[in-house]
């Protein structure tokens, strides 16, 4: 029973983190190309370059 509870809790945490991901049309060649545009647009420099487009995260802990 404890394992099932932990599995549900882990799944909810993963889904909540994915909800903070914002897909954009900002072109990129590497993750470092995304930091500045994402910080300007979402006030958070957390980003990834995926499929040549920036994905910004808007869950910065210091906001």
Curated annotation (Swiss-Prot):
One of its GO terms (cellular component) is extracellular region. The record marks 50-51 as: Important for activity. The record marks 57 as: Aromatic residue of the functional dyad. Expressed by the venom gland. Only expressed by males. Residues 1-21 form the signal peptide. Pfam families: Toxin_2. It is found in: Secreted. GO terms for molecular function: ion channel inhibitor activity; potassium channel regulator activity; toxin activity. InterPro entries: Scorpion_toxin-like_sf, Scorpion_toxinS_K_inh. The record marks 48 as: Basic residue of the functional dyad. Keywords: Disulfide bond, Ion channel impairing toxin, Neurotoxin, Potassium channel impairing toxin, Secreted, Signal, Toxin, Voltage-gated potassium channel impairing toxin. Disulfide bonds join 28-49, 34-54, 38-56, 44-60. It comes from the Eukaryota. Its main location: secreted. Belongs to the short scorpion toxin superfamily. Potassium channel inhibitor family. Alpha-KTx 06 subfamily. Has the structural arrangement of an alpha-helix connected to a beta-sheet by disulfide bonds (CSalpha/beta). Blocks voltage-gated potassium channels Kv1.1/KCNA1 and Kv1.3/KCNA3. Causes paralysis to crickets. This is Potassium channel toxin alpha-KTx 6.11. It comes from Opisthacanthus madagascariensis (Scorpion).
């Amino acid at each position: 029973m404890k394992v099932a509870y932990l599995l549900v809790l882990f799944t909810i945490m993963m889904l909540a983190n994915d909800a903070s991901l914002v897909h954009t049309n900002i072109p990129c060649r590497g993750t470092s190309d995304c930091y500045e545009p994402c910080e300007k647009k979402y006030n958070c420099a957390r980003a990834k370059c995926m499929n040549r487009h920036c994905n910004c995260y808007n869950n910065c802990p210091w906001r």
